[in-house]
């Protein structure tokens, strides 16, 4: 279900790049199961939820989805394989360097996302606390900012409760078979 067809924008990661990767639900093998960004309208809804309406939308949806897949691979990798092509997103051609605009919100959306990703991947404290939700067909990413680093679920109310309900159901089923 896409954002433009009434799916709620959930921002659980606290980092732009992670919330961008979380615009899809993922299978364990990395296949997109539930796509939230199918068109420009979906992208606009997501950007509004993040208050990024000033960011320019230069990239196509296809390019953004390719970037999302690349970022997810980088986040789930060993952390040492920071793909140099990420830097291509934030290095404009010299012909575009005619004036300097220091207003971050006016940068292209893909640049903002990549800057956020580089920040996570280059900070060992952030990267070490990066987790993937184990919920069935979820695969969302988040930084575990709890004091004891024991956060397990993207959102306890959804994935955590589903897991608990499945365990309870299995337990009751086993008891009934006895």
Model-found features: residue ranges?
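BZIP DNA-binding basic region
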Residues: 113, 125-169, 173-178
């Amino acid at each position: 279900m896409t954002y433009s067809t009434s799916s709620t924008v959930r921002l659980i990661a606290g980092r732009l790049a992670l919330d961008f990767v979380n615009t899809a639900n993922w299978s364990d093998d990395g296949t997109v199961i539930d796509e939230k960004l199918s068109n420009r309208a979906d992208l606009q809804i997501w950007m509004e939820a993040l208050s990024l309406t000033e960011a320019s939308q230069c990239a196509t949806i296809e390019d953004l989805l390719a970037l999302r897949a690349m970022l997810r691979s980088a986040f789930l990798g060993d952390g040492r394989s920071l793909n140099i092509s990420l830097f291509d997103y934030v290095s404009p051609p010299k012909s575009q360097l005619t004036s300097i605009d220091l207003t971050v919100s006016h940068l292209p959306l893909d640049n903002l996302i990549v800057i956020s990703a580089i920040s996570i991947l280059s900070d060992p404290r952030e990267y070490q606390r990066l987790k993937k939700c184990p919920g069935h067909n979820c695969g969302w990413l988040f930084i575990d900012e709890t004091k004891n680093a024991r956060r397990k679920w993207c959102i306890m109310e959804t994935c955590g409760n589903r897991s608990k309900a499945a365990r309870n159901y299995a337990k009751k089923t086993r008891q009934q078979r006895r």
